[in-house]
């Protein structure tokens, strides 16, 4: 595990941009595509700022999924896709709309909407992309970019939620999210933990109390802690000094320039 702390968010963004470019280039060189899953929240803004400082990224070879998504229209202010479209997909040239995988808007016309159907259809999109390249039971993303809530949740994997026990489905519905909107879909824990690389991006003083628990407490059952602990050699944290204020200094590493 590598935890990188920076004096301000702009430096977090710069390092994240360099990290993502490196992962993109290595993946494209290895198998011709860069498979990525994004979260919402503050992450897209930080990522967009970081990508803007990089040159030569082959966005046309990015296959983009969402680590979780709210079951709302694609132009809704709560949609992770809408946020990423505004800040990233519309801003940088090269993205192929066919390679940006959203929830199926046709399923949102059902009354009532069935979150299980939305999750199942999204899983079919994963199967279509990964079936030819992966013989394992779960897809193996090149990179997952995740956030971490003040409660230690990530994606829509919330503490003590039954979805944490799901070990068959790749995508699961969540119909009782503790934060609105309540209906969502999320990648399941086995999918997240099988990624080639995972990067958490967490900033602000509001995260300083949770980070020691998810990073340094190896008995924690919080989702972000479980993911980190199961992927120590493949997990990186990009944080600012406000968020890392309560971490042991020995936990921090210098980001390679």
Swiss-Prot record:
A GO molecular function term, named singly, is: 6-phosphogluconolactonase activity
Q: What EC number(s) does the entry state? A: 3.1.1.31
Domain of life the protein comes from: Eukaryota
Q: Which GO terms describe its cellular component?
A: cytosol; nucleus
Which reaction(s) does its UniProt entry say it catalyses? Answer: 6-phospho-D-glucono-1,5-lactone + H2O = 6-phospho-D-gluconate + H(+)
Q: Which UniProt keywords apply?
A: Hydrolase
A Gene Ontology biological process noted in the UniProt record is:
carbohydrate metabolic process
UniProt pathway: Carbohydrate degradation; pentose phosphate pathway; D-ribulose 5-phosphate from D-glucose 6-phosphate (oxidative stage): step 2/3
Pfam short name (any one) = Glucosamine_iso
Top enzyme class, one word, equals: hydrolase
Entry-linked InterPro entries = 6-phosphogluconolactonase_DevB, Glc/Gal-6P_isomerase, NagB/RpiA_transferase-like, PGLS
Keyword Hydrolase tagged = yes
Coiled-coil ranges from the UniProt annotation: none
Q: Which family does it belong to?
A: Belongs to the glucosamine/galactosamine-6-phosphate isomerase family. 6-phosphogluconolactonase subfamily.
Role played? Hydrolysis of 6-phosphogluconolactone to 6-phosphogluconate.
In Swiss-Prot or TrEMBL terms, this protein is called: Probable 6-phosphogluconolactonase
Q: From which organism does this entry originate?
A: Schizosaccharomyces pombe (strain 972 / ATCC 24843) (Fission yeast)
């Amino acid at each position: 595990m590598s935890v990188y702390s920076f004096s301000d968010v702009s430096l977090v963004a710069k390092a994240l941009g360099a990290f993502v470019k490196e992962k993109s280039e290595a993946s494209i060189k290895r198998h011709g595509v860069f498979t990525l899953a994004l979260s919402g929240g503050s992450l897209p803004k930080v990522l967009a700022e970081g990508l803007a400082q990089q040159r030569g990224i082959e966005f046309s070879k990015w296959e983009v999924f969402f680590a979780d998504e709210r079951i709302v229209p694609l132009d809704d202010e709560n949609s992770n896709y809408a946020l990423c479209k505004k800040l990233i997909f519309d801003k940088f040239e090269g993205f192929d709309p066919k390679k940006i995988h959203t929830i199926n808007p046709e399923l949102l016309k059902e009354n009532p909407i069935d979150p299980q159907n939305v999750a199942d259809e999204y899983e079919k999109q994963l199967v279509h992309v990964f079936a030819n390249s992966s013989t394992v039971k779960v897809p193996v993303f090149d990179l997952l970019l995740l956030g971490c809530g003040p409660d230690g949740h990530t994606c829509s994997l919330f503490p003590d939620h039954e979805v944490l026990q799901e070990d068959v489905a790749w995508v699961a519905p969540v119909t009782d999210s503790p934060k609105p909107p309540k209906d969502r879909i999320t990648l399941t824990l086995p999918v997240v933990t099988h990624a080639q690389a995972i990067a958490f991006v967490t900033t602000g003083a509001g995260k300083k109390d949770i980070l020691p628990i998810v990073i340094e407490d190896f008995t924690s059952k919080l989702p972000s802690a479980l993911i980190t602990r199961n992927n120590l050699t493949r997990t990186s944290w990009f944080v600012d000094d406000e968020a890392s204020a309560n971490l042991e200094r020995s936990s921090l590493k210098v980001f390679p320039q």
